[in-house]
From Swiss-Prot:
Pfam families found in the cross-reference section: Myb_DNA-bind_6
Basic and acidic residues bias locations: 400-411, 419-436
Stretches the record annotates as Disordered: 1-184, 225-244, 255-462
Species this protein is from: Mus musculus
The protein's name: Transcription termination factor 1
Amino acid sequence: MKGGTSKFKTHTETLYKKKKWSSVSEKRPQKCPSQCLESKQPQVSVLGKRRRASQTPAQETLESEWPQKAKRKKRRREPQTPAQETLESEWPQKAKKKKRRGEPQTPTQESLESEQPPVSLLGKRRRESQTPAQENSESEQPRKAKRRRKKRKGSQQPTSSLLKTPETFLKAKKTTSAHKKKKNSVLEVDMETGIILVDKENMENLLETSRKDVDIVYVDMSKGQRSAKVRETGELPAAKPQEHGCRELLGDVRSRKKQKHLQKVAPWDVVQGSQPESISLPPSEPLSSEDLEGKSTEAAVFCKKKSKKNVFRSQELEPIPDSLDDSETISERLDSTHHGGAVGAGEECESTKESHSIKKKSKKKKHKSVALATSSDSASVTDSKAKNALVDSSEGSGAVREEDVDHRPAEAEAQACSTEKHREAMQRLEPTHEEESNSESASNSAARHISEDRRESDDSDVDLGSAVRQLREFIPDIQERAATTIRRMYRDDLGRFKEFKAQGVAIRFGKFSAKENKQIEKNVQDFLSLTGIESADKLLYTDRYPEEKTLITNLKRKHAFRLHIGKGIARPWKLVYYRAKKIFDVNNYKGRYNEEDTKKLKAYHSLHGNDWKKIGAMVARSSLSVALKFSQIGGTRNQGAWSKAETQRLIKAVEDVILKKMSPQELRELDSKLQEDPEGRLSIVREKLYKGISWVEVEARVETRNWMQCKSKWTEILTKRMTHGGFVYRGVNALQAKITLIERLYELNVNDANEIDWEDLASAIGDVPPPFVQAKFYKLKAACVPFWQKKTFPEIIDYLYKNSLPLLKEKLDKKMKKKDGQIQTPAAPKQDFLFKDIFHCDDDSDEGSPEEPSASDVQ
């Protein structure tokens, strides 16, 4: 019974083999002549001859003995794969265990051959190399297992398994026959190392049953399934029409490309429409003819004795050819390396050369257009940007991911050879059209960037003296500013300043008014609607959105953000920009600091120093807010009354800072005065005693007080010494000063506190500095006006005039009747003072300020 079964199987396989040879001979025109293939791959052809010589003649004698059973065998179409037969002959017990576990069986080689003609050649060679001893082992399998496999055939995923051990090859070499020779062998299998192709379902069981000297390759058969489905539906064209279609397609693409060059538009939809709709394959990168030759040699080298890890490592480490496009990934390179074993047709080489020449022409035209738009330096930048844009487009169009790459040997890739030819021919043309459109957009953007760069580089060519002379008309102290600031204002603000002068508007500095704040908000909203940027935070704090930073920056340059942000505001645009950042900063409105926030701020400052931007992001506040708060709480700062030593250090620090800030011309004037009158003393202009003082430097010199404490204490000392110890804000004089202040503010009829001339207002009270008057007005409105934070400046002044002013006058009349006191007449303000009158240290320096109003004065 066993002998009959073995004869039946041998006869069936031989009969099916003859039928396949006849079908393959009809499709033979699809491949290259055997001489061409043997000349390109000499090592593969020699190995093929050795394998064909190992076929046994015993199989031919059994062809005419079991004709009926052969027909049943065809209906079943269940021949065992070489891997299964070898496993069952060598490890019968383990093979039975696998069947009991219900491991999904692999599809037969005959069904794969019917769907994929290139793989059928390999299947025939494997079946012919089997000995009768291996076939006898198949008769021992029960028929129930075969029926079970027949039922499960429809639900199984197509996989191919192959196991060739050194023992099997030794047996095959002993029984050789030289009368059957095949000259068209393209792909060969490693004769020394066994390879198993498995999928994820039977991977675990094969790891248990496989030997140590067998390499296992994990295969993604999704590509095989797609090609098989296309073959069954009959939508894929035949080999000859496909070859002819590729040539026609290349000709159509050339003609369309010429038309699109005239229109300066290169859409991919036209080329995609000419492609057969049945082909839906992932895009592949263009390869030159040199790459195809290199990959054919790699397929021959792959047949040597190497482990799978070493093969992949060598492929990853080898340098990428220059002819490959930059957007080709490592996973696509591995996939194309396996395809290289099946590439060798003359038609494909011709189409590759033609498409490569088209790509070279497009690159030449691209370089010419870039060279006309920009200089030689900018051309390289444009090329890199165009390549980056091309990489993005290729990745977005569906590049092959690394986990989806089919890491199978060259012989398994032959099943999709014809499909890959058409796909590569089409996809080589796609980057050509994309490069044209990308080069145009890149050249335009590069021209804009270069114009901006040239505009910035022109700052160094600006004559500093000429810029100072022209800007001095609008900013008298422009020469005191840094050279870079002067050049920037000359470039960005001089034209705006001239327009405001023609309108009769003076250039402003200092605190922004409410009207200016509203104009800034309007300008920002208009620019957002113009550019389509989502929020003001993205516009003004672009660094917080690194993914959109380049796009937002380009939009700001394109639509002249500097002009839009400063529209209608007579200030330098940089100051307007800083004010807008403060207004629209979402972290700038967090309320007061609590104890926990203060502790965090100190801890972060100990770690990061004065990196206020980083610290502000960590505590969710603006950089200005954390810097200002730390200046108040940082270090060991004293509270309460000032000591005599602290007051003396403060006076000395202010004097040093003022002298340090003086210009050389002013110092020369002081020196000339000393030479004329050696016994005299140096004088100082009034404004220099309270304007332009760096309170941060003063704080560093005092060491025990923060800058706000230093500024407040200096205002008190300066007021006392400018009035020679007079009490301008005590008793009835304080009440009269408040009444005068409210009346003068009501007469000014201004809409914002920034519009007030505090110098003129201070003269109405006496010879006092403007900061003193500002401090008194703040205390007055805070004490008398309820909810003053929510009121506008005109509303505050109206409330003081209607409600507080009558009460203050009534109180002043009562005090005048009781004490019969006299009100001092305000002294005229001096324009300069002697240094000895201001910067002297006496015994009463440590006393508290006598100018502080009492509780009764505030009421």
